[in-house]
């Protein structure tokens, strides 16, 4: 498991109080993990802080799954 994926999973588990078994790359924040729109905003802010990156609003709208977040962050980090 990549470092980015592990760090994203940790943030999601902590912020959503999610079952670690359900936090997979294909898991939708809203449909699978019970997030609402405010949770999504808080997750994006947590990702920005954890990885020291900026996620523009238009990009944040497309981050719907754990995998989407990992892919975006890896691209930003050049990983």
Curated annotation (Swiss-Prot):
The entry's comment on post-translational modification says:
4'-phosphopantetheine is transferred from CoA to a specific serine of apo-ACP by AcpS. This modification is essential for activity because fatty acids are bound in thioester linkage to the sulfhydryl of the prosthetic group.
Family designation: Belongs to the acyl carrier protein (ACP) family.
The answer on whether this UniProt entry bears the keyword Nucleotide-binding reads no
Q: Which HAMAP family match?
A: Acyl_carrier
Top-level taxon of origin: Bacteria
Q: What is its main location?
A: cytoplasm
- Compartments (UniProt record): Cytoplasm
Q: Which residues carry this modification: O-(pantetheine 4'-phosphoryl)serine?
A: 37
State what protein this is by name. Acyl carrier protein
What InterPro entries does the record point to? ACP (IPR003231), ACP-like_sf (IPR036736), PP-bd_ACP (IPR009081)
Specify one Pfam family. PP-binding
Q: Does the keyword Mitochondrion apply?
A: no
Outline the extent of the Carrier domain.
2-77
């Amino acid at each position: 498991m990549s470092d980015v994926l592990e760090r994203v999973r940790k943030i999601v588990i902590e912020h959503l109080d999610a079952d670690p078994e359900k936090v997979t790359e294909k898991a939708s924040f809203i449909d699978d993990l019970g997030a609402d729109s405010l949770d999504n905003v808080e997750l994006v802010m947590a990702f920005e802080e954890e990885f020291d990156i900026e996620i523009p609003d238009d990009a944040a709208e497309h981050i719907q799954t754990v995998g989407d977040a990992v892919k975006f962050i890896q691209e930003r980090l050049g990983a």
